[in-house]
């Protein structure tokens, strides 16, 4: 047990603030997920020395450090009983920018949209674009290997990471970047922890049987959104392990590692030129989800910048939302699904021609009943509606909420219609009507069952639905996490998804990087149970709370939680 005196002594060694009052611990007990664990303390480190002090303290006291940026993670990555290390206050600087090379080095607390505001005058931007882009931070995006609505054109965060600087679990500085095979081998001969990490990776992945097991059990190579466990399959592309690439970059392994291997202090990103200035959205309306998914396979033969789905549940949520109801201007009738296809070009005329060709193709194949073309400022209104989807779902009236547990599955695009058909059968079995939305063009729909996690019977369903969906994803060779990460909700299913042999490989990699389990324990390996440490006390008799303001529209203030 770490007493108050030891925390007071720790504070004396730090430049940043260390807080361990009940209020701050409660504030940091949750993230955007369904989980809750009371941390030992919260710290706002000011510099690298603070982080080294924290690593030493955690090692000596056998506790964990939980990295946290904006806390927008949906799977519980920022939840733990150790010290929450919040980089959003002080690690917020742009460290270097090279316009000609199109690279930028930033600290992990830089907000994604603020980064792009800085880059806009130079005609550049960072492509991955999450629905939380106005508040999510690059450190979290790297930790989760985030994607967003533009991944079919600009890729995922891992594609853009060139270098990660940080601290290892012994407090030493490290830089992971692109190396030749010979440079990698030289690293394996070093006696430091860094050298031991390189040696461990080399020894593990050089074995033919290990490579074959990875290739046979990991998600299909055609699935670009793949965050199940550590990305060891990414390293096999190097000629060091018989692949076609002449270089290898361990920073790619760190992308999606959820802060469990290294504490990142600086990230170097590759940038893209801005999207062509003229865009047109084709908002195709469909009478069924299945029809929309078949249309997606066809539409992806066109050069699309985005292909996003909203289902009837999402659309109905916006009907009674004062802010979003005005953005429903393009909706005709009562569609079961709307697909938003984005095409772009240097001129509006060319973009309209691309849109017309897409509509012609859809109509020829009898897909959809209404295909309005959206241009100009109306595009932002439409995407505001899509971006609001997640927030509106979280504020459904009553205790039943659209729960994030199976919302991140990704399969091969050609498998998507059949996968969703079988998934719907699972939902029907449990008398569930799931929510379907987001990244159809990338083979990933955010599928959410609607559950009341304050009731034991729905907590039981929470596990059953997640378990059966995991098995279905495995059947199709998919990824159980496409962009939101494993966190708590999916980590215990990693052995099912990649096989026990590969899971033990991940445990050995974690051990090589972090032998004392300092960084974010309970995530990816040796995971917390997915149906424990939930936000709510199950089957509690809810008290009636009298309020001055009227919350009757939401069935009382507690139903807003």
Model-assigned labels for residue ranges:
Residues 363-373, 469-485, 515-518:
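Flexible helix-coil linker/hinge segments at domain or subdomain boundaries
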Residues 3, 50-53, 114, 291-294, ...:
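Short, conserved charged micro-motifs
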Residues 37-41, 279-284, 335-345, 399-409, ...:
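Short, hydrophobic beta-strand segments
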Residues 10, 33-65, 83, 87-132, ...:
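N-terminal glycine-rich flavin-associated loop
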Residues 1-56, 60, 70-104, 131, ...:
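N-terminal flexible segment immediately upstream of the FAD-binding catalytic core
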Residues 33, 141-143, 151-154, 161-385, ...:
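C-terminal substrate-binding/cap subdomain adjacent to the FAD-binding core in PCMH-type
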Residues 65-67, 74, 115, 282, ...:
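Extended, hydrophobic alpha-helical segments in both membrane/secreted and soluble proteins
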Residues 475-479, 487, 492-496, 500-561:
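Ferredoxin-type iron-sulfur electron-transfer modules and their immediate structural context
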